[in-house]
Structures are given as structure tokens and as C-alpha cells.
Curated annotation (Swiss-Prot):
Protein name: Protein-glutamate methylesterase/protein-glutamine glutaminase 2
Written domain comment of the UniProt record: Contains a C-terminal catalytic domain, and an N-terminal region which modulates catalytic activity.
Domain CheB-type methylesterase: 154-343
HAMAP family: CheB_chemtxs (MF_00099)
Family, per entry: Belongs to the CheB family.
Organism name: Syntrophus aciditrophicus (strain SB)
Molecular function GO terms recorded: phosphorelay response regulator activity; protein-glutamate methylesterase activity; protein-glutamine glutaminase activity
Cellular component, GO annotation: cytoplasm
PROSITE patterns in alphabetical order: CHEB (PS50122), RESPONSE_REGULATORY (PS50110)
Stretches assigned to the Response regulatory domain: 5-122
PANTHER family noted in UniProt: PROTEIN-GLUTAMATE METHYLESTERASE/PROTEIN-GLUTAMINE GLUTAMINASE (PTHR42872), PROTEIN-GLUTAMATE METHYLESTERASE_PROTEIN-GLUTAMINE GLUTAMINASE (PTHR42872:SF6)
Gene: cheB2
Keyword Transmembrane helix set for record: no
Amino acid sequence: MSKIKVLVVDDSAIVRKIFTEELSKYPDIEVVGSAPDPFVARDKIVHLKPDVITLDIEMPRMDGLTFLKKLMRHYPLPAIIVSSLTPKGGKLTLEAMDIGAVDAIAKPGSSYSVGDMSGQLVEKIRAASGARVVRKSTQEMFQPGSRLSIRSLAETSNKVIAIGASTGGTEALKNVLSRMPPDSPGILVVQHMPANFTTAFAERLNSLCQIGVKEAADNDSVTPGTALIAPGNYHMILRRSGARYYVQIKMGPMVHHQRPAVDVLFKSTAKYAGANAIGVILTGMGADGAAGLLEMKQMGAGTIAQNEKSCIVYGMPKEAVKIGAVDKIVHLDSIADEIVRMV
């Protein structure tokens, strides 16, 4: 089996050394080179032909975003963004996702060890090596589809929509949520993403959608017309008190090497919302969410999976389909319509 060839692009010699040493421990990965800036990276990409690059977002001579735009236009290949755990880093990372990056990881630091980073980075590289890279124009803007409507707020106030995504999910979620009508049932979202990145992600979605979108806080009510995004590094659990749905935000052990984990949300939704829920699993690597979606279906919830053609990585939906957890397999552009039909 051929190895996955990786090029590390980072202005920090320390980060280049750490990434090279850590990735070299895995027999299926070969670090074919490293580059301190985009100009060196450009030449190495042409000559070394890597399968995946890791790309620092903030570099001298040419910043990572500018380089990524050029890369996607002339030599598109899977890029994993490496960014600091800061609000600025989160916003830049989301811009990179818009341009065409397939995933992101936080730089190792005081609260995020090399060991934590290593395992996650390897999984992201493996997923990225098989990702479908979408070539985008630098002027391309996402255009929402037709505006949907739901019959009445009263009919939907006891419904809950739970959505899970990983690699490629930032763009997929933008597609789905921007098409949801303002009278949608309450929506809960788990996107595999580091802490601080989710704050910027929620703010960005809120500016694009008819519904309100916010990063979830402990004890937030689940209300019609609002989507709650699980904060990075915390699980989000649905609870119910009488007629009120609310979320619990807590640490807890990682599930499928993830926190937040989709399975944690889906299993709690199965327990507390039952047949009043709709579960949606979008593009992403691994199997997170499959077991939880099956529990939702067994409790009477409607379940939807993104189809292979429209996925960046057909991993999580594939696993859900494989175990019989899915009612409808739908192209990304039709998922919002399918949710409305199920409501």
C-alpha cells in the first residue's frame, strides 16, 4: 500500500520539526518535505507532488490565505489548516475553509499537547488524502437555495433537529442552515472543531442565515428559529424538563477521539426527544454519529445522510448507512428541503 505523502508548510522551524517527527512515526505516512513559506512550498509541491499539505495560516512573505487561493486555482490538493487557538485564528481558519481547505487543527501549545495533536493530525491527514477537493473561484459566494417555509410555529415547537459533521462540514452546514426558514424547529449542531474556532463559526453562520445561530452555553434552551453550535472541546447533550428542551455542555471523555462528539448529541436526542427529532449526518471521517443516529431511528426519529457524491469525505454517512441508521440519503443541496418535509 502506498504511503500518504505530506508536505509541512509552516514558518516555525519548531513546528516543522514536531510535525515531521510525529508524522514519521506512522508507517502509512511519509513527510516528503517541509517549507518555511509559500514560495518554497510552491516549488516543493510541483516537484514532490504531495497528497496532502499542512498549511500555517499566518506566515511572512505571503499569508496562508493568499497562498491557498492560488493553490486552489492552479494546483488544487487537500490542505489542512494549522492555526492558533485565538479568535483571530478561528476567523482566518473559516476563511480558509471557504476557499477550499478540507480541515483544520490547532497548533500545539500550553493547553494542547503534542500528543493530543499527533493522533488528531494523523486522522485528519488520512481523511484528507481521500477528500474530494472543490475548486472555487476566489469571487465565489455561497448562494442560498429557495426560501423554505414551515406550516406554523406551534406545530414545530416540540421538534428538535440534531446535525453532526466533521471534515468538510463547515461548508456543508453553511449550505443546510442558510436554507432553513426562520420558523424552523430548534437545531443542535456538532461540528468537529477545536475550541475558539466554534465561536467564530457560529458568528459567521449567524450573519448568513435566516435563523439565529450561536455557540451553545450550558442550560441554553432549544427554541424554534435558533441553531446552537457545540463549543469546541465540550460535549453537547440534549435534556428535557417538562415541555422545555435545553442543552448541557460538559467535558467528559472523548468519544471516537472527539469532543464534541456527534454520538453524544444523537444518543441524548434519541433519549429525550424520541420521535420528535430529526437526525442528520453530514460529510466527515470516521464513524462518529452512526450508532447515535441508529438509536434515534429506533426511537422513531426521521434520519437523513448526505450522499457520497456531495461529501468531501464519505465516512460518517457511509457508516450510518451501513448499519441501517438512515431513512433518506440526500444530496447536500436537498437536505434542508428534506428536513422541512420530515417536520
